[in-house]
Amino acid sequence: MSKGHSDHPSAGESWHLYKRIFGFIKPYWRLGVLAIVCMVLAAAGQAAFAWIIQPLVDGTFIEQDPGARLWVPATLVGIFLFHGVTTFASDYTVAWVGRRVVKDVRQAVFEQYLRLPTSYFDKNSPGTLLAKLTYNVNQISAAASKAVVVLVRDTFTVIFLLAYMTYLSGWLVMIVFGLGPLVAVVVTAANKRFRKLSRRMQASVGEYAQIAEDGIRGQAEVKIFGGQRYEAERFDRTNTRHHRQLMRYKAVQAASQPLAQLGAVIALAIILYLATMDVILETISPGGMISFIAAMLLMLPPLKRVIGVNAEIQKALAAGESVFEVLDAPPEPDHGQRPLERARGLIEFDRVAFRYPESEDWVLRDINLSIQPGETVALVGRSGSGKTTLASLLPRFYDPQRGEIRLDGHPLAEYRLQALRSQMSLVNQQVVLFNDSLANNIAYGLSERPTAAQLQAAARAANALEFIEELPEGFDTVIGENGVMLSGGQRQRIAIARALLKDAPILILDEATSALDSESEKRIQEALEKLMRGRTTLVIAHRLSTIEDADRIVVLDAGRVVETGTHRELLDHNGHYASLHRVQFNGPS
């Protein structure tokens, strides 16, 4: 368990989190100073309400001073206006800064997600990552807005009221301070509990968000396999756990405030009792006594908020820990400096071995493979043989633990990631499309927007132009989340068009035609054959009929290269490839 995850963080750790949270406020420090000034003035206006009571009682009702009858009401109106204006100014300014902080933190977290290695996403579910981006970041807003308002305005309100009460009767104020240790004990105990429960609540938000995402995204599978009851019960368990954590949090919050207020009420009761004693009546006027009691009553609500804000602060600090874990996570290693305009396409795997993080099983073992520029190499093998993993090492989604991969004679790590990946186009087995127009999906990632003719050429080559032109908006049609408005074959063809338009010298085709019907597949294969000329192409396919014309076929088994050759050579060899071929075309013997 990391240091930042201890249930009882030290004051130093909390202060470090405060500094990091308020570091996001630094760009807006001028507005922050303005807000603080307005909050202090609003606090002074609040204290002025207690002050005006003494001349109101003594001057207007007891002494019946004609002048007091004029200036006291006018001053009361002025105090109200002053307090209202300063309160509005502080609340609006703090809200603006707080929302800007949320925007900046959320942007920083999202950009960090884009920089993190693939292994990070293997270990963290999308629901958890989305919860950090939305729920946890919003909790930080409490420290940047509501907590600041309470800690500054309400704290200064208490200070000003205490100062005025001391001016009226220092002896009575000592009674109020006498019960201060009780309040401190309650607040300290509540702080530890708040932080612990806040972490648990935020973790449960990620859990039920993930379950909800699974149920919504996989709704077809849920329905066809009758999993509605199972998913509902799974969500109910997590939702109930979150509810319990929330109610425990609310119980601590509800108990801590009355206990702390009890001390203040006891002090008020003692003061009311002492107010009837002659020794007190000789030192303070009736208006002063009423003003003192009014000041104490006015002090209770801000005191309650100051005590209650600890819950928000601890919640924000717990959220801050979670968010800063993301921001502190090491990004993909990218230390290369070698320029790369356009690769020739010579790829070499030199004794490469790889296993996934936190796994002891080697997925790839001692891979030696050289792919010449412009050569089409197909990777085949049983499921789990390492085909897709081998291809994922080329764009450095992962780095091998042993051996070296070279492009044009230089190790991949010598190139900047952006330069390296700009040389590759990928059509993955799991097609990813964005909730945007077809044109933007096909042109995704290009530095310059392609012309309409270029878009049409790419779509035509991918056998997609015909169905695109039949859509009401054509290339401007928004296709929904992950292309939900398109069929599986259409989505695959859009992904191929995207790869065609990028025109990279290296192609990675992972099950690139697996979702196409026979006629479309034939036409796509023709287009891909034209595209692959002069380009280094790595094809991963389970269906051996799609790679019979490859320049070379590499057969993987248990993470090792066991055979290599052309389709005819491997059939004549009567080894692993021939066995796979017989299973696919003749059925198991």
UniProtKB/Swiss-Prot annotation:
Residues at which ATP binds: G381, R382, S383, G384, S385, G386, K387, T388
Subcellular localization: Cell inner membrane
Chain segments annotated as transmembrane: 33-53, 70-90, 148-168, 170-190, 262-282, 283-303
EC number: 7.5.2.6
Annotated ABC transporter domain residues: 347-583
Membrane topology, as annotated: Multi-pass membrane protein
PROSITE patterns according to UniProt: ABC_TM1F, ABC_TRANSPORTER_1, ABC_TRANSPORTER_2, MSBA
Domain ABC transmembrane type-1: start-end pairs: 33-315
Catalytic activity: ATP + H2O + lipid A-core oligosaccharideSide 1 = ADP + phosphate + lipid A-core oligosaccharideSide 2
Gene Ontology MF terms: ABC-type oligopeptide transporter activity; ATP binding; ATP hydrolysis activity; ATPase-coupled lipid transmembrane transporter activity
CDD domains to which the protein is assigned, alphabetical: ABC_6TM_MsbA_like
Enzyme class, first EC level, given as a word: translocase
InterPro entries: AAA+_ATPase (IPR003593), ABC1_TM_dom (IPR011527), ABC1_TM_sf (IPR036640), ABC_transporter-like_ATP-bd (IPR003439), ABC_transporter-like_CS (IPR017871), ABC_transpr_lipidA (IPR011917), P-loop_NTPase (IPR027417), Type_1_exporter (IPR039421)
Record's comment describing the protein's domains: In MsbA the ATP-binding domain (NBD) and the transmembrane domain (TMD) are fused.
Subunit structure: Homodimer.
Function summary: Involved in lipopolysaccharide (LPS) biosynthesis. Translocates lipid A-core from the inner to the outer leaflet of the inner membrane. Transmembrane domains (TMD) form a pore in the inner membrane and the ATP-binding domain (NBD) is responsible for energy generation.
Protein name in the entry: ATP-dependent lipid A-core flippase
Protein species of origin: Alkalilimnicola ehrlichii (strain ATCC BAA-1101 / DSM 17681 / MLHE-1)
Gene: msbA
